[in-house]
Amino acid sequence: MSDHSKALHVAVLAFPFGSHAAPLLALVCRLATSNPTVRFSFLSTAQSNTHTFPSTRTNEFDNVRPYNVWDGVPEGHQISGNPHVGTGFFLKALPHNFKAGMAKAEEESGATINCLLTDAFFWFAGDLAEEMGVPWVPYWTAGACSLSAHVNTDVIRITLGSTRTTQNTNQTLNFIPGLSAVHMNDLPGGVLHGDLESPFAQMLHKMGLNLPRATAVVLNSFEELEPAITTDLKLRLQKVLHVGPPSLSSSPTSSLDESGCLLWLDKHEAASVAYISFGTIITPPPNELLALAEALRASKIPFLWSLRDHSRPIFPEGFLENVLAFGKVVSWAPQSQVLAHPSIGVFVTHCGWNSILESITGGVPMICRPFFGDQTLNSRMVQDAWRIGVRLDGGVFTKSSMMSAVELIFSREEGKKLRENIILLKQKATDAVGASGSSTENFNVLLEVIKTCKHPKS
């Protein structure tokens, strides 16, 4: 056997939808920097790899190589605007598309795969790893709170039942460590409500059942954010390794700021500007966009709004002209840099996990408008567990709900307390990625897991 064939080779299986592939690639790049002799084959769909692998990053790491796998869409089939259709096709192609991709990676590299690093969604990777005789290391790209909900799905279903009524929707999960603030109604779809038999819900259920088989479960968070949940997960899983927040644990990068957001922010006082963004996938319904715009115009607070161009016709007539003196609307903003800017006073967000972490590391309290997935659960933790933000009255944007939330953050004692709380969390996050911090130690454990992978045939 050649020395090349004995080289460590990690197959990385990415979920190609939403904001899953990018955090996984960021983790892989950290690992590749610390393990320059280890080969990482990053497997995802062609469309996902095109977006996730900009040319600069591809050229930066000699030991990270993307491989395209079949997306499951039949030849000649046109995907509609519904994103769930593409997800459904992809799920039907699993795991055969990844098996084919791994075979190609082994053939091209001449190195047998020694480890599977996967999105935690892929419960079947436990079976693949067992067949191959290699470790399975799943990466949960969200927080410990949502992971706990999936690990404890059967307990939740037995305790609360699967039928929501007006009497039980506000029942809390006080029987699960760290989730006492969470209401039954906050749970992601597929845990207790929604179509429990859908392929996606079944995938998440099987994930929760199979994670105890994993060599280690890696989380995109830090232990000090959810200590009780982390302690409980450590009793249920073999290794629980929080390695974030990624914006603090990785080398700082400067994104292009073609819209001049940072220069515009430089002109404003500390903690005076509202930053508004709902990520790259979500756009609030037109009536809510209109209400949000009316609230911003009426309140006259300085604001920076990242909003795709196709949504701008929703604005009230004359809106952009009316707010020119105190507002700025852009099609894209360098979010991590914006949230780190001292002039930002509040983040109006959908509560995606990456956005929450960036808000914490920026020390910016939040106004929450969740839409789907783990976002409602995350927003509950933001408001009632960590006390670093507020949810909108009624759960949606109206002119009055937005103005009330803004007034609370900027003008009331409660808002001052929220800011103090998130500054304390920011320090804990900074400490976690320090030289002797918990996330640094966990990352070193992950490095050892990979370094000690043995050739499956040795």
From Swiss-Prot:
Family matches, as Gene3D superfamilies: Glycogen Phosphorylase B (3.40.50.2000)
Record field: catalytic activity: a flavonol + UDP-alpha-D-glucose = a flavonol 3-O-beta-D-glucoside + UDP + H(+)
GO molecular function, one term: cyanidin 3-O-galactosyltransferase activity
UniProtKB keywords: Flavonoid biosynthesis, Glycosyltransferase, Transferase
Primary gene name: F3GT2
Tissue: Expressed in ovaries.
Protein name: Flavonol 3-O-glucosyltransferase F3GT2
InterPro entries, per the entry: UDP_glucos_trans, UDP_glycos_trans_CS
E.C. no: 2.4.1.91
Binding site for an anthocyanidin: 20, 150, 373
Domain of life the protein comes from: Eukaryota
Role this protein plays: Catalyzes the glucosylation of quercetin. Preferentially uses UDP-glucose as sugar donor, but is also able to use UDP-gal and UDP-xyl. Is probably not required for the accumulation of anthocyanin in red-fleshed kiwifruit varieties.
GO terms, biological process: anthocyanin-containing compound biosynthetic process
UniProt similarity note: Belongs to the UDP-glycosyltransferase family.
TM stretches of this protein: none
